[in-house]
Amino acid sequence: MLILAKRKVEAAYAARGIPADNVKIASLDIERLGNAFTPEDRVSRIYINFCNPWSKNAGSNKHRLTHPRQLLQYRQLMDEGAEIWFKTDDDDLFRDSLSYFPAAGFEITWQTFDLHKNEPDWNLRTEHEGMFSEQGIPIKALIARKGPDSTV
């Protein structure tokens, strides 16, 4: 599945004339993120697309990929000013994420509750994005920039 995803990303980048030589697709357990990267590994952008929204029951929201607990782990790999691009169809997850990012020292620099209403030319539609959009479900999206470590 990851090979197909990488091929789709490479094709989408090629169609827009964007080099994809530095794109890495990884399927990792966030709890083991530190085991997969060295302190020298740096990330300039992370995409979180249509992740499991996890209900708020019994504290399961801490498993959300945008929960501050997870965002703090991403921060360890990110240079100051690096970005997280996040898309979801889930209203509750998006609303909660609007507070999660600042709590973890990220500044939300762009957000929308309906990505396709005024779709930016830089948006690369994912398969899930197309599927939800065809069902009339608005796609929520944001870009968050990592602030200085002193903000956490």
Segments predicted by a language model, with ranges:
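Short, well-ordered alpha-helical microsegments
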Residues: L2, L33-G34, F94-R95
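Conserved class I S-adenosyl-L-methionine
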Residues: N57-S60, E83-A104
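S-adenosyl-L-methionine
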Residues: K6-R45
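Compact, Lys/Arg-rich rRNA/RNP-binding cores from ribosome-related proteins
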Residues: A5, R64-P68, D90
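A short glycine-rich, Lys/Arg-flanked "PGG" loop and its adjoining helix->strand segment in the class I
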Residues: K62-E83
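Class I S-adenosyl-L-methionine
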Residues: F94-V152
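A short SAM/SAH-binding and catalytic strip from SAM-dependent methyltransferases
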Residues: E31, F37, V43-L65
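Conserved SAM-binding loop
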Residues: A5-K6, S97
